[in-house]
């Protein structure tokens, strides 16, 4: 997975995440929206409306109480924690 910063402002961050699709992006967006200080988290994977863009771009907006890069790091940690919890539950059920 390669990341490319599109825009990095004080309260807004846009990053292209190469090789991912709706499955991962929805989970990441949900984790970001659970964070205090994140006012919006969206992603775009629409090549028709984006001039041929095929890799997803996640956009994070904050209220200024959290840096958008820190929010991305915390959101990714939440995804990892949820994945680990699911794996443990799955193994226990098998």
UniProtKB/Swiss-Prot annotation:
Give the matching InterPro entries.
Answer: RBP11-like, RBP11-like_dimer, RNA_pol_Rpb11_13-16kDa_CS, Rpo11-like
Which UniProt keywords are listed?
Cytoplasm, DNA-directed RNA polymerase, Nucleotidyltransferase, Transcription, Transferase
Main localisation = cytoplasm
Gene Ontology CC terms = cytoplasm; DNA-directed RNA polymerase complex
Which superkingdom?
Archaea
Enzyme group, top EC level? Answer: transferase
**Record EC number:** 2.7.7.6
SUPFAM superfamilies in the record, alphabetically? RBP11-like subunits of RNA polymerase
**Reactions catalysed, as given in the entry:** RNA(n) + a ribonucleoside 5'-triphosphate = RNA(n+1) + diphosphate
Which Pfam families does the entry mention?
Answer: RNA_pol_L_2 (PF13656)
Q: Where in the cell is it found?
A: Cytoplasm
Q: Which GO terms describe its biological process?
A: DNA-templated transcription
Q: Does the keyword Transferase apply?
A: yes
Q: Which Gene3D superfamilies match?
A: RNA polymerase, RBP11-like subunit (3.30.1360.10)
Which Gene Ontology molecular-function terms are recorded? DNA binding; DNA-directed RNA polymerase activity; protein dimerization activity
Assembly, per entry: Part of the RNA polymerase complex.
Record family assignment: Belongs to the archaeal Rpo11/eukaryotic RPB11/RPC19 RNA polymerase subunit family.
Q: What does this protein do?
A: DNA-dependent RNA polymerase (RNAP) catalyzes the transcription of DNA into RNA using the four ribonucleoside triphosphates as substrates.
Q: Which HAMAP family match?
A: RNApol_arch_Rpo11
Q: What is this protein called?
A: DNA-directed RNA polymerase subunit Rpo11
Lineage, highest ranks first: Archaea, Methanobacteriati, Methanobacteriota, Stenosarchaea group, Halobacteria
């Amino acid at each position: 997975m390669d990341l490319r910063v599109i825009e990095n402002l004080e309260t807004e961050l846009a990053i292209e995440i190469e090789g991912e699709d709706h499955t991962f992006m929805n989970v990441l967006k949900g984790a970001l929206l659970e964070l205090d200080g994140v006012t919006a988290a969206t992603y775009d994977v629409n090549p028709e409306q984006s001039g041929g863009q095929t890799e997803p771009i996640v956009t994070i907006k904050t209220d200024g109480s959290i840096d958008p890069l820190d929010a991305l790091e915390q959101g990714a940690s939440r995804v990892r924690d949820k994945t680990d919890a699911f794996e443990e539950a799955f193994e226990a059920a098998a």
